[in-house]
From Swiss-Prot:
Role summary: Probably a ribosomal protein or a ribosome-associated protein.
GO molecular function: structural constituent of ribosome
Signal sequence bounds: none
InterPro entries: PSRP-3/Ycf65_sf, Ribosomal_PSRP3/Ycf65
PANTHER family for the chain: 30S RIBOSOMAL PROTEIN 3, CHLOROPLASTIC, OS04G0461100 PROTEIN
Subunit and interaction comment: Part of the 30S ribosomal subunit.
Official protein name in the record: Probable small ribosomal subunit protein cS23
GO biological process: translation
Provenance organism: Synechococcus sp. (strain JA-3-3Ab)
Length: 99
């Protein structure tokens, strides 16, 4: 049974969010990166996940809730914090970047 996981790029002016499919601990990209606040990453991610009808509603809701939490954290001062703190706050999300 496939599992899905968020990944994020923690950038100076943007937060980029994408979804990977996880099979046997191996990650494969499932979506492109969606950027916040440059674009409405949450709405774009929602539309992309809804277009993949084989992803369960429960998985879509879980991923969107995680994306909401991550966006809120980034917006509310998290972008000023080290990536290591964001990774500790969100251990289920793979976070990288240059900020």
């Amino acid at each position: 049974m496939p599992k899905f996981a968020l990944k994020a790029l923690w950038l100076e002016n943007d937060l980029a969010i994408a979804v990977d499919q996880v099979v046997a601990k191996n990650r494969s990209p499932l979506t492109r990166y969606f950027f916040w606040p440059r674009d409405d990453a949450w709405e774009q991610l929602k539309a992309e996940l809804e277009s993949k009808t084989w992803i369960s509603e429960e998985d879509r809701i879980t991923l969107l809730n995680q994306a909401t939490e991550l966006i809120n954290y980034w917006q509310n001062g998290g972008r000023e914090r080290p990536i290591s703190e964001a990774q500790a706050q969100f251990p289920d999300i793979l976070i990288g970047g240059n900020a």
